[in-house]
Amino acid sequence: MIPMHCPQCNKISIKNGRYKDFQKFKCKNCSLQFSERSLSFFHRHRYPEEIIRNSILFCMFVSTRISKFMLQETLQFKPSHVSIYRWTLKFANHLANLKRSRSFSNIWHVDEKFIRVRGSKDDFAYLWVVIDDKNNMITAHVSLKRDINGAVAALTKANKIAEKPPDILISDGLQAYKKACKKVFGRKTKHFQAHFKTVVKMIGNRLYFLSNNRIESLNSKINLWYKRFRGFKRLATANLWCEMWMHFYNLIRPRVIPHKTISIHAII
């Protein structure tokens, strides 16, 4: 058996009884008491780990109140909808701080859609989404206005995450993308406008059939998830939830195009 080390002084600890199904430990050096859960995502939670994981997964598709009903009917546990919301919020912050290196292709698609955020000057705020041609989400950014500043912020964020500019950027007819692409990526990145109709372009020695239907299809999936919120209370909260769904889409959610997925057990 591998000995347990103290998280505070790194000395070998001794067993000190049990709490429910968890082994407790006590450090011989600093007398710190802790358990197997002390440094995990589930520290100081009284519900079992599977209940918390399932509630978080349910919340990716339905509201917290429906998640509460599903847990009660399937697993006979009755956490409050507020507890489920707090678990999901903690998971969102955990994903935001998770550093994972991903590789993206050289063809990117960008689009924006309106969402409701309390406090926005217009009737709506705007969610900017950048993906590559393999359906991997690179970034999701929420801004209060649909202008060049929002486009620059989204593309700058995507460039920082991917650590390289794309060769081709495809967008709809919004003129802000043209200036934002030149400002963020420079002249080496080719920008093309292609909405629902396919645009045929010869670049170098290759013929490209360019369309933005790929990201329009993703927007329909975002709508199904966003519908359960009915809007966000703050801009920071909107960015946090949208980034959480982006990580969920990239890492966990199965897609038509084959890609490597991981279980939520590998994250928390």
Task: List each model region and its residues.
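Active-site beta-loop-alpha junctions of metal-dependent nucleic acid enzymes
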Residues: 46-47, 90, 140-164
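Short, cysteine/histidine-rich loop/knuckle motifs that typically chelate Zn2+
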Residues: 7-8, 29, 221
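Residues immediately within or flanking Cys/His clusters that coordinate Zn2+
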Residues: 3, 24
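C-terminal domain-tail junction helix/linker
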Residues: 228, 232, 239-268
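Short amphipathic alpha-helical "interface-anchor" segments enriched in bulky aromatics
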Residues: 63, 207-246
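Short, positively charged, Gly/Tyr-enriched micro-motifs
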Residues: 26-106, 112-121
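A short, conserved beta-strand element enriched in hydrophobic/aromatic residues
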Residues: 70, 125-147, 154
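Short Cys/His-rich "knuckle" micro-motifs
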Residues: 14-19, 37-40
